[in-house]
């Protein structure tokens, strides 16, 4: 069952869901909590690898990812990150989110931003039960104009569902969890599959 605003506020108050820094009530509406854009970004460096063979040997996949991903880029609150049409970039939410093992979260983009061509998650919008960390955003500009993204802007909304029971293998207990406790714009770790 999806949590309504009153349930979200109660779960935050009781510490069942933790969002740091805690959002004020103006950012909680209906069935969601607005999340803000953080300061860390990563971009793909052009022409540094001819392709990435996703089913190739792990060492080769890892080396190719290292070649194409930039180091983390820090954008000050007063600055903007420009996402050009057709570009993919990684960013991170300002908030860190911790979920118990019986709640799953979902990240949705904002309709107003989507109408300008901005996708905030390419496909990965589920936040697993047991998750703890900041949420990586997979930005894609499908529009025709460059978009200026400013740290601190409302970038998406989280909503939460209670599950039929507690997960037997929540994210924080899995030994193979690749992004456990992530705090920055972590690049793909597909080579660890």
UniProtKB/Swiss-Prot annotation:
DCTP binds at residues 110-115, 128, 136-138, 171, 178, 182. Keywords: Hydrolase, Nucleotide metabolism, Nucleotide-binding. Its EC number is 3.5.4.13. Pathway: Pyrimidine metabolism; dUMP biosynthesis; dUMP from dCTP (dUTP route): step 1/2. Transmembrane segments: none annotated. It comes from the Bacteria. GO terms for molecular function: dCTP deaminase activity; nucleotide binding. The keyword Nucleotide-binding applies. GO terms for biological process: dUMP biosynthetic process; dUTP biosynthetic process; nucleobase-containing small molecule interconversion. It is an enzyme of class 3 (hydrolase). The active site is at residue 138. SUPFAM superfamilies: dUTPase-like. It catalyses: dCTP + H2O + H(+) = dUTP + NH4(+). Belongs to the dCTP deaminase family. PANTHER family: DCTP DEAMINASE (PTHR42680:SF3). Homotrimer. NCBIfam families: dCTP_deam (TIGR02274). Catalyzes the deamination of dCTP to dUTP. This is dCTP deaminase. It comes from Tolumonas auensis (strain DSM 9187 / NBRC 110442 / TA 4).
């Amino acid at each position: 069952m999806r949590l309504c605003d009153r349930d979200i506020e109660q779960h935050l108050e009781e510490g069942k869901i933790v969002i740091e820094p805690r959002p004020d009530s103006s950012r909680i509406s209906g069935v969601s909590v607005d999340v803000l854009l953080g300061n860390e970004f990563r971009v793909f460096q052009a022409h540094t690898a001819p392709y990435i063979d996703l089913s190739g040997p792990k060492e080769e996949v890892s080396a190719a990812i290292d070649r194409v991903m930039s180091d983390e880029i820090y954008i000050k609150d007063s600055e903007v990150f420009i996402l050009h049409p057709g570009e993919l970039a990684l960013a991170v939410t300002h908030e860190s989110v911790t979920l118990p093992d019986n709640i799953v979260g979902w990240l949705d983009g904002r309709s107003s931003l989507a109408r300008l061509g901005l996708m905030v998650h390419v496909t990965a919008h589920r936040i697993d039960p047991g998750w703890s960390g900041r949420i990586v955003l997979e930005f894609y500009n499908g529009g025709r104009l460059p978009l200026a993204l400013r740290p601190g802007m409302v970038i998406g909304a989280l909503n939460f569902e209670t599950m039929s029971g507690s997960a037997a293998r929540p994210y924080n207990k899995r030994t193979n969890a690749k992004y456990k406790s992530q705090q920055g714009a972590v690049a793909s770790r597909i080579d660890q599959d």
